[in-house]
């Protein structure tokens, strides 16, 4: 099975250039005729070469007559030599006189003595031959491997056609009916004749009819599967019998070489061994047949032939793999193309590159941003050809050979020429692992002594490089086009913003930040305080003269006329600002965040060129003043707070108290654990705050007046951490505060914290406790790097063909976006969320209703600011999810190109950028788990809600009861409380947990900071809604409830336990005096409360209680530390649409929940809507139900704890909701780690997951029921049907995991190079699939330019005229860095 097209192009001169004009590539099953056509002769002997003459044996596997001469233009016997005899066939040895490279393309063949089934079509599940003949795999194998007979024609017997019978059964039937009563067959011949007999047209009609008439779903599925294969054969030109081979092709000998080693031995490709076995067995079979050997011997030989061909095509697929001399399985044809070492991934997608070198990197603090230091030795080697041609051109060398000698001798003139060649010649620097496109950037080389590459310090963040021994690779772009691309697109100066989130990636770090921070800090009572200056230059002069200190507080008249309070240091930083950048941005303490803001603003306000110059100047002054400051760390700098002892003593007392309560049985073990952990977390935070307070301020005294003032501290550790140069508060805390709680390997938090810090030193026990965290960190790093890399690979594969294909798709659909609110706090404002997007509808002012912005406006910083000022809370934006482009996405739906700041260009590969943006931090995060040393960090549990705004309280769906203290207790989980301002706009909204005490009423005026509600963060209470007598049902000692007496406390608590039998339902009912169960207020639901496993009873049977009393409480889960390690698998789980481990039950309709007993050991919940049928849900025993009896739930709401399954969300809430849910959940994981990724990247990937639909009813189209079809294809087909007056098909949306989506892509080349290569190729060849080469991968594989960026069809087919230029202008870089992109003329 080979690619016909490639063979038709073979050998022609046009064949070499033809690849550019390929329209599509087709794969199909090769017919015996076509295999013979490709072949140049039959291989009859298993011999390879003659061991004495080393010449190929005639008719053997390396035969020169079949495959071509071994030496260029020389026949085997040596009669004809040299070019003049080209094309002659030697009459003596039969070899054509031609170039020996034909041995790479000429094929041979083996004529098989008996047909053989192709293992791919037999064993790739589901078996193609089996499905077509409607036979099981086991039966098929029995027949093919000569174990049983198959009935070809039952004749007069009672057997059915295609029935498989054993040898014994066959003999019995012959005894009974006689020899000629039936026709049976065995082996591939029988199967071949059956396949030949098939009438596919009739079979199709029959299957379609049967599929429509049947009721059984399983049968329908089976029929559809068979129908698909039948249709595939009918639509392609393939014939079923070609799945059984009569001829085996032999690949060209140069592709399975035989290489002589020293000592007269040979190394050979495994394929030669496999071919040899096939030929040997084939020849033996021919001989046995000619001799008329007994049937059983021939059968055995045929079986062995089948097995040897199987091994040749796919060794190890069936039975044991054939091994070579050293016991290693031989590599078959399938293994050659499969996996990381296979043809696709090793040789076609990843090639080694010429003109490249690698070396260690060192920092180059003196370089400009567009430069890198290249060692002279490397440059000499990389630019050799250029030097040769220059030497020849100058007349310094007469031939290339003499030029070569000059270069080898390293003559002086060579170095001058090298300087000239290298000047302004862009080169590429790459650091592995290249996780995003900023891992390869272009620089101009400066020749340097030594052997290390010098790297500009500001690009280290993009490369994630440091100088502890990292290596980088250098590549030289050769063609003019490549050089222009490097210059205009890849130059480090053109990659200032990160493609992931649009923030600057070229930002000073470490020393530079420290230097700038030091410059801009102000101090009291410094030399020159209070002086006033008439202009910035005067300040610099005064500082240089030594009459003022760097940190003195002074007044300066600025060029715009304002008199500003500032310091000399800030004025000096202000001097390097480009025009258009406000001095106010540096008239503050420059921390890393502020510097990033400065660079971002400079980029927007002053342009690329100015920003580049600014960054370089900041780097220079930053280094200079970091050196002048001379900041170092000493042990004394780690000041331990005075109050540490007190805080520890108080906490210990509190913990002792909790222990006492636990012993007295007031609280349970889980509660004790939670409370203790909370106490220590709080203690750690308190000590940490105290330490920071003490370390972050110095008290300055004025010697003259004795006045004292607080100043920001000059403590080196504090300066490093506060400026963002190195370290964080967490690490400072561990140095000088306390290390805090640690986690066990299982993720649980150990109750005893490490109270010492590193300055005090750890005891042996404390040191031992902290080893857990350290080891976990290292283990995680090793394991997760691989996971993250694999996630990136899958992401890239699913979106590799998403390209910006048009300017506007004209959709009227989009997404509604509002503020991002978590737990009532606005985590991200609307303006931030919609930045860089395009509005879908005109935006109107909520108060005046005037139109602020028309539809299709790109929201840039200015528009976003206006949105914020107008108080707009939500608006509709366009999104990749709703884009209607058939291929790729349109520019308007995508919005801004984050790395460039304007609307995205047509031809941009937004898919790959999205995949890289999501995959890159994955690796970063996994590598950074251990930075906190496994110290358990955990937020103190929230236990109340305070108003963030002043306004009026509004209650939504709140059910509450008044308890005896007159407080409102919230019932159920569906309640929310919100605040509305005077205009009636909702400002905030919070979910109220069950059992919360509510402090406000509907419509009450609320001040900012007022307490709205509070609750117990460790327990979930079950509150009684009515007064009455307690009556226990199914609460039976030892069966459903256990009196847990603590060994430590001797106190007993009654806890509901896991119960084995199914018919128990522990509950507490409230009755009147006669024992009749009361009903809940405002409903007729009985006041009976079912209790989950783990609930602790707070009342006794028969006790009298009032409304609002707590019947029982369930401790909330003890907290485990969250790591991104929990995060990466979560991201993968979402992208792969896997069933979550803790799957939640989701309601599919709106309605009221009622608890309806148990069935099969599961609790039954019924949701009753206002109209229509009710729905039942079964909940497993241990699962905690999050709704209470009588709650109102919306469709899509979770009834139990856990994560909902994505298919459920899609079914209930639809595509948009699902897409939104996915984006939010994935963003949660990344935000938790402080990683910023723009939503649009995740949307692009989710778009690919949702690009298919499942056909429900094919109508009068060519689709089949249950078929998965591309949305675009489905739309087009339906449109056609409607135009022609046929019934269109109906379908439902489908969500696929990224691996599945990659494998079902329309390009078989791309899918095959991803995973499951043999399966993909088998399916594709069966369908005779065309690959239209639209994605990036398939084009790289066939060796063309990718259809994106400068290779996009609109750019490639246009003529660009460039005026002649003799000399390259000196300031080529300056021109280009600030220059716009080249204009393309059509």
Swiss-Prot record:
Reactions catalysed, as given in the entry: RNA(n) + a ribonucleoside 5'-triphosphate = RNA(n+1) + diphosphate
GO MF annotations in UniProt: DNA binding; DNA-directed RNA polymerase activity; magnesium ion binding; zinc ion binding
Cellular component, GO annotation: DNA-directed RNA polymerase complex
Residues that, per the record, bind Mg(2+): 466, 468, 470
Keywords noted in UniProt: DNA-directed RNA polymerase, Magnesium, Metal-binding, Nucleotidyltransferase, Transcription, Transferase, Zinc
Transmembrane found in the keyword field: no
GO biological process, one term: DNA-templated transcription
Top-level division of the source organism's lineage: Bacteria
Known EC number: 2.7.7.6
SMART domains: RPOLA_N
Cofactor binding notes: Binds 1 Mg(2+) ion per subunit.
UniProt-listed SUPFAM superfamilies: beta and beta-prime subunits of DNA dependent RNA-polymerase
Leading EC class: transferase
Cofactor(s), names only, from the UniProt record: Mg(2+); Zn(2+)
InterPro entries: DNA-dir_RpoC_beta_prime, DNA-dir_RpoC_beta_prime_bact, RNA_pol_asu, RNA_pol_N, RNA_pol_Rpb1_1, RNA_pol_Rpb1_3, RNA_pol_Rpb1_3_sf, RNA_pol_Rpb1_4
Residues annotated as binding Zn(2+) 1: 75, 77, 90, 93
Binding site for Zn(2+) 2: 809, 883, 890, 893
Family: Belongs to the RNA polymerase beta' chain family.
Entry-linked PANTHER family: DNA-DIRECTED RNA POLYMERASE, DNA-DIRECTED RNA POLYMERASE SUBUNIT BETA
Subunit and interaction comment: The RNAP catalytic core consists of 2 alpha, 1 beta, 1 beta' and 1 omega subunit. When a sigma factor is associated with the core the holoenzyme is formed, which can initiate transcription.
Function recorded in the entry: DNA-dependent RNA polymerase catalyzes the transcription of DNA into RNA using the four ribonucleoside triphosphates as substrates.
Name of the protein: DNA-directed RNA polymerase subunit beta'
Organism of this sequence: Oleidesulfovibrio alaskensis (strain ATCC BAA-1058 / DSM 17464 / G20)
Organism ancestry: Bacteria, Pseudomonadati, Thermodesulfobacteriota, Desulfovibrionia, Desulfovibrionales
């Amino acid at each position: 099975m080979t690619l016909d097209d490639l063979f038709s192009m073979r050998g022609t001169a046009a064949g070499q250039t033809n690849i550019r004009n390929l329209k599509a590539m087709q794969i199909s099953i090769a017919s015996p005729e076509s295999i013979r056509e490709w072949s140049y002769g039959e291989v009859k002997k298993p011999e390879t070469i003659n061991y004495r003459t080393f010449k190929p044996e005639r008719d053997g596997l390396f035969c020169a007559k079949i495959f071509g001469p071994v030496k260029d233009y020389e026949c085997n016997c040596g009669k004809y030599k040299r070019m003049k005899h080209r094309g002659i066939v030697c009459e003596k040895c039969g070899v054509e006189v031609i170039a020996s490279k034909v041995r790479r393309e000429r094929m041979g063949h083996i004529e098989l003595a008996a047909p053989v089934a192709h293992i791919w079509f037999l064993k790739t599940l589901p078996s193609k031959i089996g499905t077509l003949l409607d036979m099981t795999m086991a039966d098929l194998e029995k027949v093919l491997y000569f174990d049983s007979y198959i009935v070809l024609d039952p004749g007069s017997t009672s057997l059915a056609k295609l029935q498989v019978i054993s040898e014994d059964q066959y003999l019995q039937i012959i005894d009974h009916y006689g020899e000629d009563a039936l026709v049976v067959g065995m082996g591939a011949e029988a199967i071949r004749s059956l396949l030949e007999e098939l009438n596919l047209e009739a079979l199709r009609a029959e299957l379609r009819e049967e599929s429509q008439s049947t009721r059984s779903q399983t049968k329908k599925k089976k029929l559809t599967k068979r129908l698909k294969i039948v249709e595939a054969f009918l639509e392609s030109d393939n014939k079923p019998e070609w799945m059984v081979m009569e001829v085996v092709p032999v690949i060209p000998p140069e592709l399975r070489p035989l290489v002589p080693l020293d000592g007269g031995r040979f190394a050979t490709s495994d394929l030669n061994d496999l071919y040899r076995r096939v030929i040997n067995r084939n020849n033996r079979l021919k001989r046995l047949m000619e001799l008329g050997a007994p049937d059983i011997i021939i059968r055995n030989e045929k079986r062995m032939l089948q097995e040897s061909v199987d091994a040749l095509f796919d060794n190890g697929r069936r039975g044991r793999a054939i091994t070579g001399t050293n016991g290693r399985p031989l590599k078959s044809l399938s293994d050659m193309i499969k996996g990381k070492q296979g043809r696709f991934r090793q040789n076609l997608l990843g090639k080694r590159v010429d003109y490249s070198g690698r070396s260690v990197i060192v920092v180059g603090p003196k370089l400009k941003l567009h430069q890198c230091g290249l060692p002279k030795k490397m440059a000499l080697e990389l630019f050799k050809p250029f030097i040769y041609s220059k030497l020849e051109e100058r007349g310094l060398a007469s031939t290339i050979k003499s030029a070569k000698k000059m270069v080898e001798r390293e003559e002086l003139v060579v170095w001058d020429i090298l300087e000239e060649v290298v000047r302004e010649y862009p080169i590429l620097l790459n650091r592995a692992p290249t996780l995003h496109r900023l891992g390869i950037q272009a620089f101009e080389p400066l020749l340097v002594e030594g052997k290390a590459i010098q790297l500009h310090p500001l690009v280290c963040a993009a490369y994630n490089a440091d100088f502890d021994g990292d290596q980088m690779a250098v590549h030289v772009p050769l063609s003019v086009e490549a050089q222009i691309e490097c210059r205009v697109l890849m130059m480090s100066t053109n990659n200032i913003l990160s493609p992931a989130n649009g923030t600057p990636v070229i930002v000073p770090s470490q020393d530079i930040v420290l230097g700038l921070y030091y410059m801009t800090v102000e101090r009291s009572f410094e030399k020159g305080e209070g002086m006033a200056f008439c202009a910035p230059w005067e300040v610099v002069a005064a500082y240089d003269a030594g009459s003022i200190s760097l940190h003195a507080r002074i007044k300066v008249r600025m060029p715009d006329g304002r008199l500003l309070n500032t310091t000399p240091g800030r004025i000096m930083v202000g001097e390097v600002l480009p025009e258009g950048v406000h001095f106010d941005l540096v008239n503050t303490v420059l921390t890393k965040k502020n510097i990033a803001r400065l660079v971002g603003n400079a980029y927007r306000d002053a342009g690329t060129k100015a920003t580049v110059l600014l960054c370089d100047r900041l780097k220079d002054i930053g280094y200079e003043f970091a050196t002048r400051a001379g900041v170092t760390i000493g042990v004394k700098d780690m000041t331990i707070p005075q109050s540490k002892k007190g805080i520890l003593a108080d906490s210990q007392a509190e913990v002792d108290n909790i222990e006492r309560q636990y012993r007295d049985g007031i609280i349970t073990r889980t509660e004790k654990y939670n409370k203790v952990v909370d106490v220590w977390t709080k203690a750690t935070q308190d000590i940490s705050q105290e330490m920071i307070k003490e370390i972050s301020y110095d008290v300055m005294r004025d010697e003259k007046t004795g006045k004292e003032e607080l100043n920001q501290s000059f403590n080196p550790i504090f300066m490093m951490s506060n400026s963002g140069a190195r370290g964080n508060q967490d690490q400072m805390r561990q140095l000088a505060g306390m290390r805090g709680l640690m986690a066990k390997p299982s993720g649980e938090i150990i109750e005893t914290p490490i109270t010492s810090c590193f300055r005090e030193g750890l005891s042996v026990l404390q040191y031992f406790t902290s080893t857990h965290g350290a080891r976990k960190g290292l283990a995680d790093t090793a394991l997760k790097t691989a996971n993250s890399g694999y996630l990136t690979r899958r992401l890239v594969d699913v979106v590799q063909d998403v390209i910006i294909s048009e300017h506007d798709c004209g959709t009227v659909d989009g997404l509604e976006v509002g503020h991002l609110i978590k737990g009532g706090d606005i985590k991200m404002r609307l303006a931030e969320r919609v930045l860089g997007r395009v509005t879908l509808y005109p935006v109107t002012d909520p108060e005046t209703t005037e139109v602020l912005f028309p539809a299709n406006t790109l929201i840039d910083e200015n528009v976003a600011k206006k949105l914020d000022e107008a108080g707009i809370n939500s608006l509709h934006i366009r999104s990749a999810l709703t884009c209607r482009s058939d291929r790729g996405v349109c520019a308007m739906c995508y919005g801004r190109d984050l790395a460039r700041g304007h609307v995205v260009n047509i031809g941009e590969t937004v898919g790959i950028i999205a995949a890289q943006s999501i995959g890159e931090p994955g690796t970063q995060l996994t590598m950074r788990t251990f930075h906190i040393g496994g110290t358990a960090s955990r937020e103190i549990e929230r236990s109340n809600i305070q108003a963030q705004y002043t306004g009026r309280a509004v209650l939504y769906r709140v059910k509450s009861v008044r308890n005896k203290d007159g407080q409102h207790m919230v019932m159920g989980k569906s309640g929310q409380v919100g605040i509305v301002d005077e205009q009636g706009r909702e400002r905030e909204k919070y979910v109220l947990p069950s059992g919360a005490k509510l402090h406000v009423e509907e419509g009450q005026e609320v001040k900012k900071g007022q307490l709205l509600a509070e609750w117990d963060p460790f327990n979930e209470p079950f509150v009684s809604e009515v007064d009455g007598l307690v009556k226990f049902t199914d609460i039976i000692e030892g069966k459903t409830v256990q009196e847990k007496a603590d060994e430590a406390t001797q106190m007993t608590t009654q806890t509901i336990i896991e119960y084995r039998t199914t018919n128990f339902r522990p509950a507490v009912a409230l009755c009147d005096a006669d024992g009749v169960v009361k009903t809940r207020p405002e409903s007729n639901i009985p006041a009976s409360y079912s209790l989950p496993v783990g609930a602790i009873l707070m009342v006794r049977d028969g006790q009298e209680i009032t409304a609002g009393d707590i019947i029982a409480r369930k401790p909330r889960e003890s907290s485990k530390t969250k790591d991104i390690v929990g995060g990466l698998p979560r991201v993968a789980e979402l992208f792969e649409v896997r069933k979550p481990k803790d799957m939640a039950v989701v309601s599919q309709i709106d309605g009221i929940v009622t608890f309806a007993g148990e069935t099969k050991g599961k609790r039954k919940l019924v949701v009753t809507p206002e109209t229509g049928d009710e729905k039942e849900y079964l909940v497993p025993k241990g699962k905690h139900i999050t709704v209470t009896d009588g709650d109102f739930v919306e469709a899509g709401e979770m009834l139990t704890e856990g994560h909902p399954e994505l298919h459920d969300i899609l079914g209930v809430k639809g595509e948009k909701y699902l897409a939104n849910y996915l984006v939010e959940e994935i963003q949660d994981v990344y935000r938790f780690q402080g990683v910023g990724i723009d939503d649009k990247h995740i949307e692009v990937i989710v778009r690919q997951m949702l690009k298919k639909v499942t056909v429900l009813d094919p109508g009068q189209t060519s689709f089949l029921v249950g078929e998965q079809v591309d949305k675009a294809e489905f739309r087009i087909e339906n449109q056609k049907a409607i135009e022609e007056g046929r019934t269109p098909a109906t379908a439902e949306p489908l969500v696929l995991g990224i691996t599945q989506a990659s494998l079902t892509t329309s390009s078989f080349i791309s899918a095959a190079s991803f995973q499951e290569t043999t399966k993909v190729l088998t399916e594709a060849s069966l369908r005779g699939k065309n690959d239209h080469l639209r994605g990036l991968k398939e084009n790289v594989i066939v060796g063309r330019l990718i259809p994106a960026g400068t290779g996009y069809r609109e750019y490639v087919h246009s003529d660009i005229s460039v005026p002649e230029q003799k000399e390259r202008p000196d300031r080529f870089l300056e021109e280009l860095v600030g220059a716009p992109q080249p204009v393309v003329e059509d």
